[in-house]
Curated annotation (Swiss-Prot):
Gene Ontology MF terms in the entry: zinc ion binding
InterPro entries, sorted: Pre_C2HC_dom
Signal peptide positions (record): none
UniProt keywords, alphabetically: Metal-binding, Transposable element, Zinc, Zinc-finger
Gene name linked to the record: gag
Full protein name: Nucleic-acid-binding protein from mobile element jockey
Zinc finger (unnamed): 393-406, 412-426, 433-447
Chain spans, region Three zinc-finger-like regions: 393-447
Functional description taken from the UniProt entry: Strongly basic protein that binds directly to retroviral RNA and may be involved in its packaging and in the reverse transcription process.
């Protein structure tokens, strides 16, 4: 390794040439690579100790963790005599040794140095911690390739190293046998496009915020901006004050250490998002209500109709279609049957004759549901059903937000590494969940954190309010107003009882008493009706238990009778 070499060879312009070079390097023996990495680390450690003893500058440092991983970080500081770049080179020696560059080849080391220099130039947020720490220990299950054994080991902190170092260290493991390797370039490009569309860069000017009025798009309340791992809240307040002023926001910190920033209007919300993005801060937020599209489901239109035709059809009605999506479903009628296990497997999915269309918000957007014809098709336009699922980010795989509004370093859903899911950098056979630390992927449907959030999303059943509570409340309110509730009208009274003088009320009293005796539940107040109902249910359950016992005894008696008949038939002379 050249510690002070500031000149690096540039990357090949063609990606195929780069991959071909990596394939040539991957032909080395893994055992040889392992020994070379360990020897290089040992020599680096000795040189670092001698350099630190004889100089006042910060020179290479070597760290070794408890899970047999070896990390070598080389940093060349800026001195008065010379100014060089910052390089970060790391290698991991674990249960599965991936294809790594042998010592002495400068092509991959130069590539890693360039990526490390790019990560170093990104900068650091002044009020945010460099790494994302976790207080709970996570259990990891190591599944070794071509073996049956499973070794359980414990990792105390998955994100102790900064994401920039982890990203640079993962470049040494470009070539692998990962099944998601074919999706690497596509996943990276998609995520870059998402960030470019939804997150503003630092080169754009922050718009002037008028704090004396609400946003022109609508008076809706802006969502919270969540900033994790804030170690210097005073610096955060200074950054927000310089952006939108001290009377335009409020902060609330949760028990998990996430600082939620609430702004007074949409203009302040957009200004804070752009300012935090320019500071290279890691945070996430949600979409403004006025920016959310109006999603409708168009039924009755053929699946092969071009999207441009649908856009023109909505434009004729005065609506702007932002996005059009045709859902797919499995075609079980044309499924192929595997010869090995005789199980039907779906080989493709067919498009449904339905479209989900995102329309731009407007004052008359609700009239889109009255559309009955689009072009030559008679259609039915309905409001798209809301998905009752847990929202999970496909970038950092944390629940509660989406990838389009996540400005955090990517985390792999398989190994919890600091790289995109499905990229060439994922070469580990370790499954690690980001949310619970279990030995499964972060997108697993059986994750206990996901199950708990689903349980909280379901509405809890409400118990019926007893009648006596309502009646008593009404009676108390009537008494407070000075009204006396009228007496109940007595029933079962004859003509003689009505015309009898008031002094003799024997028959009427007897009639009422006889009514009470005939209906014992009448003596109970309305508050005891539930107790009486519960008692009746218990009696019914007891009777049902007795009935089940009688039925069981009857079945056993019939069985014994049949056996007796069979014995008698067998003893009869032929």
């Amino acid at each position: 390794m050249n510690y002070g070499n500031s000149s690096t060879r540039s990357l090949p312009s063609d990606r195929s040439a780069k991959l071909e070079e990596m394939r040539k390097i991957a032909g080395a023996d893994p055992a040889t690579i392992r020994s070379q990495i360990i020897a290089s680390g040992a020599s680096t450690s000795n040189q670092a100790a001698s350099l630190l003893a004889n100089s006042a500058f910060n020179y290479p440092s070597v760290t070794t963790s408890s899970d047999t991983s070896f990390t070598c970080t080389v940093t060349t500081s800026q001195a008065s005599c010379a100014s060089t770049s910052t390089y970060t080179v790391a290698a991991r020696v674990g249960p599965n040794i991936c294809s790594t560059t042998p010592v002495g080849n400068n092509s991959v080391s130069d590539t890693m140095a360039q990526m490390a220099g790019k990560a170093a130039r990104k900068g650091k947020c002044s009020f945010q911690a460099p790494g994302l720490s976790s207080s709970k220990k996570r259990k990891v299950v190591v599944n070794a390739c071509q073996t049956i054994r499973k070794v359980k080991m414990q990792a105390t902190d998955l994100r102790k190293a900064t994401p920039k170092v982890a990203t640079a260290s993962a470049t040494a493991t470009t070539m692998s046998n990962n099944r998601f390797a074919a999706l690497a370039l596509e996943a990276d490009n998609v995520m870059e496009q998402d960030l470019a569309e939804n997150c503003s860069n630092g080169e754009e000017d922050v718009p002037v915020v008028n704090m004396n009025r609400q946003s022109t798009n609508g008076p809706s309340k802006p969502p919270a901006i969540c900033v994790p791992n804030v170690d210097n809240p005073h610096s955060l307040e200074q950054a927000l004050n310089s952006c939108v002023g001290d009377n335009s926001y409020s902060i609330r910190t949760s028990k998990f250490g996430v600082s939620r920033i609430y702004t007074i209007n949409a203009d302040a919300f957009r200004a804070v998002v752009k300012h935090l993005t320019s500071l290279n801060c890691q945070f996430w937020h949600h979409q403004l209500r006025e920016d959310k599209p109006y999603t409708v489901a168009v039924k009755g239109m053929h699946a092969n109709v071009p999207k441009a035709q649908i856009e023109h059809a909505f434009a004729d009605h005065g609506f702007e279609a932002l996005n059009i999506y045709c859902p797919r479903k499995a075609d079980w009628r044309n499924a192929q049957v595997s010869e090995d296990d005789d199980e039907a497997t779906v080989n493709f999915k067919t498009r449904q004759n339905m479209f989900f269309v995102n329309l731009k918000q407007g004052p008359k957007i609700a009239e889109a549901l009255k559309i009955t014809q689009l072009g030559r098709y008679r259609v039915t336009v309905e409001r798209a059903p809301r998905r009752r699922e847990v929202l999970q980010c496909l970038r950092c795989h944390i629940f509660g937000h989406s990838k389009n509004y996540c400005v955090r370093d990517p985390i792999c859903a398989k190994c919890a590494g600091s790289h995109m899911t499905g990229s060439l950098l994922c070469t580990s056979d370790i499954c690690m969940c980001v949310n619970c630390g279990g030995d499964h992927a972060s997108t697993d449907k059986d994750c206990p954190v996901r199950i708990e959030k689903l349980r909280k999303m379901k509405p809890s059943p409400r118990l019926p309010v007893p009648d006596n509570a309502t009646n008593n409340k009404h009676n108390r309110a009537s008494s407070a107003r000075g009204f006396i509730p009228a007496e109940a009208v007595r029933g079962n009274m004859s003509y003689a009882d009505i015309v009898r003088p008031k002094g003799s009320q024997f028959r009427a009293t007897a009639t009422i008493n006889s009514q009470h005796e005939s209906n014992p539940l009448h003596d109970l107040g309305s508050g005891n009706k539930f107790l009486t109902l519960e008692k009746s249910i218990r009696e019914i359950n007891g009777r049902m238990d007795q009935l089940f016992k009688l039925v069981q005894e009857t079945v056993e008696a019939n069985k014994a009778f049949r056996e007796l008949v069979q014995v008698l038939i067998s003893r009869m002379p032929k």
